[in-house]
A protein has these predicted regions:
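Active-site-facing alpha/beta catalytic cores
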Residues: 71, 76-323, 366, 374, ...
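Glycine-rich, charged/polar anion/phosphate-binding loops
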Residues: 48-50, 273-276, 303, 332-334
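N-terminal basic/disordered segments at the start of proteins
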Residues: 1-63
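Non-transmembrane, aqueous-exposed alpha-helical and coiled segments at domain scale
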Residues: 300-310, 315-347, 353-403, 408
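Basic/polar N-terminal segments that are highly enriched at the extreme N-terminus
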Residues: 1-4, 450-457
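A general structural signal for short secondary-structure junctions and capping/turn motifs
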Residues: 53-56, 94-96, 279-280, 381-385
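Short loop/turn segments at strand-loop or loop-helix junctions that form parts
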Residues: 64-69, 106-109, 349-352, 395-397
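Short N-terminal secondary-structure initiator segments
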Residues: 2-11, 49-80, 292-305
């Protein structure tokens, strides 16, 4: 791979899962306009996230990454942003207690608009149109006008991302993230009849907060109890958009993609000689790599060399998405290869993408029991390999949807139709996300206990 890189050098490579725009002049005019827009995030924030992820890779923190499968223009509303942010905060408090370490909070938000599809086109009643590829590219309604890729959508996506980030910054720094307030939300959750098993953890958190308050440690005296750091991420799929938002940082002289703090490359676009790897190798942002059953270990090691030539801690997060039936047969070999090569990475579990099934009623869904099973195996495998399970990557929402089966609400196949609102893949609802956080808290506590015991031997 040539060492010469620029924000547009990806254009010389094979770019998979990219839309074909009919009017190139319209596209170029739009991209030129976006290239003059202010950055959505700042380079210093991306550096801070990389530093925090470095702590994760060293086993001193845990990554919670979650949000929508694909953001939509139609669902853009401050309440939806608030509810997703709220449930991530609630999960983080529970996980902090279990892990006894900081939780790095990263949202799939403020830019997660593009989705790769298995088929470039879709056929209904003998009419063949472009597949829906996310609101930044085309519309979900099955008609020619909606399905044709439209450059104007890039500007709408930028504007929505800017508004979302503005609200997230206000929430994270303006008192909404107060620790006592978040804990009160969790207390309300465990009051539910089916959530009794989580009350012990919640009561112990309550005792800790009461003790801190008695010592004069509260949101008024300690900023960290009233505010939080929250970062954004999305898949770097639509490279024209990413290129337009790639800028030189004035303080370091290095290139950053200012569309998000963290970008990731998907399972379908991580070809070593492809356009997406070419683009990502030149930016300083933290980068995620989706690792699935099709991953060839030798190629993954070469990708790590390309994307992180200095083996920098916090630069690379490997997002493992195997499926609960395959993870035990695939992940150990990958861990051993990466570990023996001495690569600094954050290991996270994406228990969503490998566990989708088609229900008897025809809905694409994900059983919560399968999601939990993959996470459990992920932890067990890392324990066996002597490596650190550094995080989870979830498709979730703060809304009360019925898209994934199971959980305390006991959502069944028949219930899916009630509030199945996703534009793409099924998401955990707020209750299922919190339930998962309480279970994860137990896993993390056990992990810390075993780690302490082994260090004392």
């Amino acid at each position: 791979m040539s060492d010469k890189w620029s924000p547009n050098s990806w254009r010389n490579k094979n770019a998979l899962h990219m839309p074909n725009y009919q009017n190139e002049d319209h596209l170029n005019k739009t991209l030129n306009e976006i290239s003059k827009y202010p950055p959505l995030v700042f380079a210093g924030e991306a550096r801070l996230l990389k530093k925090k992820l470095g702590e994760v890779s060293n086993g001193n923190a845990f990554l919670l990454q979650g949000g929508d499968c694909a953001e939509s223009f139609a669902d853009f509303h401050p309440d939806n942003i608030r509810d997703t942010f709220k449930v991530i905060l609630q999960m983080a408090v529970v996980l902090t207690f279990g892990a006894s370490c900081p939780i790095v909070k990263v949202g799939r938000i403020a830019g997660q608009f593009a989705k790769p599809r298995s088929s470039a086109t879709e056929v209904i009643n003998d009419l063949e149109l472009e597949s829906y590829k996310g609101d930044i590219i085309n519309g979900i309604d099955f008609n020619q006008k909606d399905r044709d890729p439209n450059p104007d959508r890039l500007i709408q996506a930028y504007n929505q991302s800017a508004s979302t980030l503005n609200l997230l910054r206000a929430f994270s720094q303006g008192g909404f993230a107060n620790l006592n307030k978040i804990h009160q939300w969790n207390l309300n959750f465990v009051k539910g009849e089916n959530a009794a098993k989580f009350r012990e953890i919640s009561s112990r958190i309550d005792e800790c907060l009461s003790f801190m308050e008695a010592c004069g440690i509260n949101g008024n005296s300690v900023r960290q109890l009233n505010e939080t750091d929250f970062f954004t991420s999305h898949e770097a799929l639509l490279l024209q958009y990413e290129e337009a938002l790639t800028r030189i940082d004035s303080t370091s002289g290095k290139w950053y993609d200012v569309s998000a703090h963290m970008l990731w490359v998907g399972d379908r676009t991580r070809q070593l000689d492809g356009a997406h790897i070419e683009f990502l190798r030149g930016i300083e942002n933290p980068i995620g790599i989706k690792v699935g059953p099709s991953t060839k270990t030798e190629e993954l090691l070469k990708i790590l060399d390309v994307l992180n030539p200095n083996n920098e801690a916090g630069k690379i997060t490997l997002i493992c998405r195997m499926g609960h039936e395959k993870v035990s047969g695939i992940l150990p070999k990958i861990i051993r290869s990466v570990n023996s090569a001495g690569k600094n990475v954050v290991w996270t579990c994406d228990p969503m993408h490998g566990n989708a099934i088609k229900s008897n009623t025809g809905f694409k869904t994900r059983p919560l029991k399968d999601i939990i099973s993959e996470i459990q195996q992920f932890f067990q495998i890392h324990r066996s390999e002597g490596t650190y399970p550094g995080g989870v990557h979830l498709e979730m929402t703060g809304q009360d949807v019925t898209e994934c089966m199971g959980g305390l609400q006991e959502i069944t196949d028949e219930d899916l139709k009630n509030r199945y609102h996703t534009y793409c893949d099924p998401r955990l609802n707020a209750s299922q996300s919190l339930e998962l956080a309480f279970l994860l808290s137990d896993f993390l506590k056990e992990e810390k206990l075993l780690s302490k015991q082994s260090s004392n031997l």
